[in-house]
């Protein structure tokens, strides 16, 4: 692993770093600027109330108070960037076909199984909606899926971005999320002005991206709990990396994310007190997350006193956390081995530097 990490550092990496995403960092609390609250990022829109990854879900996310929207990109058979999490149409649209085998004309006629039976949007449709003046501050995380050729998919994303012009340049509103080295390299080639983030579920794999200048991270929250996660968080803070975490739906997990930003001496991005470790919380329930933020601040301000846990409950919570950490670490190793065997986790030592375009 040390040799793989060393391969990321070269002269080219110092000359043309990946752009940063200052709009995506944790925000200072209006109550106390020393508190840095992770932004609320709606996972596939407001998917608890609307069919996921539809325009209705995106509109619902904004109404729920989300600062940003996370959504997923696939490529149709005729080269159109479309929004869907699954490569198959079965779960959401009830059709046993794959997106990559269907034309946009066919896909556009489908409706979700879940009511109110929404159509699949193109990335272009989503961007056109985002041009509305009242949505100017809403930003986006694109989860670029691995099921297509990376160059073809990034080129299709680029065509969609070029076809729609908004009040703020898209490279100042969009973070492009990539799972592996091949897709990161394609993004650097096709979308050189856009901030990038590595999406990860295995710290064993994610670790070798740490030394890529300005590369953000979007990591499964389960992997960040426990000793290995703590070390990874410390390294992200030391190198001032953007960090988003997913999918955080339980109040305890939401509060854990908020508390990671407490007790640090200085914010490196703004030279002010209270650095953020976690910049964004990707959740199915942005409204609940905003409520948890308010409750957390009430506690910090002395307006709310948390009931003291009994000894039995304290022991139970610690046992649950230990079990959670052990299961997560075991699952992470198995997942890492599986994805390497499938050829999905390629390393940067096998690619050109991300900073050579």
Predicted regions and their residues:
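Catalytic domains of carbohydrate-active enzymes, especially glycoside hydrolases
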Residues: 57-75, 126, 211-217
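Metal-dependent phosphodiesterase/phospholipase catalytic core, i.e.
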Residues: 17-32, 37, 85-200, 219-220, ...
